[in-house]
């Protein structure tokens, strides 16, 4: 068991009780980027997964040892973000497989964004798992990706052996919508669109179709126990203005797995892409790989 207490360097530090020592040791080591930046110079090239009657998905794949790692991006984010690239460099350095991809309608993938939905992006994740990934996988989901990784673990329990959520936005857009005054909800329904303010979009807001919100409601998970039994690690910034950090506590409470850690960063925001945030993410992945490899052997 591990408890988390305030620490000047990290915002939170781990105090270990018993067997759970891997992450504690990782945090005490020198920062991972000091060695993985000089690792293998292997380049991943852009490829496309062709799917009958569905948009082709753009992806980059690094072949290597299992468990492999799959990065699932956030809402309207592409595969080239700082976290995805950092994980790829780390996987190169240790020889493990890695996949990053774009949702349909986003980035280099085919598809019409206006027709996209949580359900369709869920299918995208499963397509990557079924048709590209080989062997057991650790899923790393950022924001919306943290919601979709839970769905993937439920649908493919034999292949998904661990989850890492970064500012997991489970049920996010639906919860936000229903927190609005009833009059505003009706106005959005009549208008057919919700202009959601966001400092992370150059326009200053996201235009979310009402149909997207309505469809997303069919994929909510927090209303009942979540049948995920693998190890789960949930990282969240306490300065997150988009998805409150309490959401990760809700997810931790709802998943049935007994092996769940919630790790809070006191001064981190929703994106969690500062140097110390990336360090924590890489150490968490490293710890899970070590834990799962020990169990396997």
UniProtKB/Swiss-Prot annotation:
<feature type="active site" description="Charge relay system">
    <location>
        <position position="143"/>
    </location>
</feature>
<feature type="active site" description="Charge relay system">
    <location>
        <position position="270"/>
    </location>
</feature>
<feature type="domain" description="AB hydrolase-1">
    <location>
        <begin position="69"/>
        <end position="181"/>
    </location>
</feature>
<keyword id="KW-0809">Transit peptide</keyword>
<dbReference type="GO" id="GO:0102390">
    <property type="term" value="F:mycophenolic acid acyl-glucuronide esterase activity"/>
</dbReference>
<dbReference type="InterPro" id="IPR029058">
    <property type="entry name" value="AB_hydrolase_fold"/>
</dbReference>
<feature type="active site" description="Charge relay system">
    <location>
        <position position="240"/>
    </location>
</feature>
<dbReference type="GO" id="GO:0004553">
    <property type="term" value="F:hydrolase activity, hydrolyzing O-glycosyl compounds"/>
</dbReference>
<dbReference type="GO" id="GO:0008474">
    <property type="term" value="F:palmitoyl-(protein) hydrolase activity"/>
</dbReference>
<keyword id="KW-0378">Hydrolase</keyword>
<dbReference type="InterPro" id="IPR052382">
    <property type="entry name" value="ABHD10_acyl-thioesterase"/>
</dbReference>
<dbReference type="GO" id="GO:0002084">
    <property type="term" value="P:protein depalmitoylation"/>
</dbReference>
<comment type="similarity">
    <text>Belongs to the AB hydrolase superfamily.</text>
</comment>
<feature type="transit peptide" description="Mitochondrion">
    <location>
        <begin position="1"/>
        <end position="43"/>
    </location>
</feature>
<dbReference type="GO" id="GO:0005829">
    <property type="term" value="C:cytosol"/>
</dbReference>
<comment type="function">
    <text>Acts as an acyl-protein thioesterase that hydrolyzes fatty acids from acylated residues in proteins. Regulates the mitochondrial S-depalmitoylation of the nucleophilic active site residue of peroxiredoxin-5/PRDX5, a key antioxidant protein, therefore modulating mitochondrial antioxidant ability. Also catalyzes the deglucuronidation of mycophenolic acid acyl-glucuronide, an active metabolite of the immunosuppressant drug mycophenolate.</text>
</comment>
<dbReference type="GO" id="GO:0005739">
    <property type="term" value="C:mitochondrion"/>
</dbReference>
<dbReference type="InterPro" id="IPR000073">
    <property type="entry name" value="AB_hydrolase_1"/>
</dbReference>
<protein>
    <recommendedName>
        <fullName>Palmitoyl-protein thioesterase ABHD10, mitochondrial</fullName>
        <ecNumber>3.1.2.22</ecNumber>
        <ecNumber>3.1.1.93</ecNumber>
    </recommendedName>
</protein>
<keyword id="KW-0496">Mitochondrion</keyword>
<dbReference type="GO" id="GO:0006805">
    <property type="term" value="P:xenobiotic metabolic process"/>
</dbReference>
<dbReference type="Pfam" id="PF00561">
    <property type="entry name" value="Abhydrolase_1"/>
</dbReference>
